Design a protein with these regions (language model features):
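Mature-region segments of soluble proteins
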Residues: 109-111, 122, 139-141
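Preference for long, well-ordered alpha-helical segments
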Residues: 125-144
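Heme-based O2/NO sensor domains and their adjacent alpha-helical segments
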Residues: 5-21, 34-117, 130
Length: 144
């Protein structure tokens, strides 16, 4: 009896990338990922539609910024910094304490889409990243 391989849960949120040209390199490496994260959190502070998700974070966003940077580094095909420092991301488990509904997902995406528009000049890459971010954000919903 041949068993089919079981895919890990992380597959649901893994960004497909070419081994020879990962999204991490296409986006511009470490500094570009840091700029994207910084702009994302600036927008979370600025956009009225992001108030509810901003309220889910502590006043000091520095730890959240660093963790998102570490996660995105590996998720985009760069160094797996988050896993090296904190172990497996376990995104769903870590987000379960927060009420993430469609509105929260859409607010998060509004911040990320705008950050992508401002920070990623390649339209095809931007569209690929936006689609993958949406899948991940929707995967984290724990309420309708």
């Amino acid at each position: 009896v041949k068993q089919s391989p079981t895919l890990p849960l992380a597959t649901a949120v893994t960004l497909p990338a070419s081994v020879d040209n990962p999204h991490y390199r296409q986006i511009g490496g470490e500094q570009a990922v840091r700029r994207l994260v910084e702009r994302f959190y600036q927008l979370m502070d600025e956009l009225p539609e992001a108030r509810a998700i901003r309220a889910m974070h502590p006043p000091d966003l520095a730890p959240a910024k660093e963790k998102l940077f570490l996660f995105l580094s590996g998720w985009l095909g760069g160094p797996p910094l988050y896993a090296e420092r904190h172990g497996p991301p376990r995104l769903r488990q870590k987000h379960l304490p927060f009420p993430i509904d469609t509105a929260a997902r859409d607010a998060w995406m509004a911040c990320m889409n705008r950050a992508l528009e401002e920070q990623v000049s390649n339209a095809d890459l931007r569209a690929q990243l936006a689609a993958s971010f949406f899948k991940t954000a929707d995967f984290l919903r724990n309420q309708p």
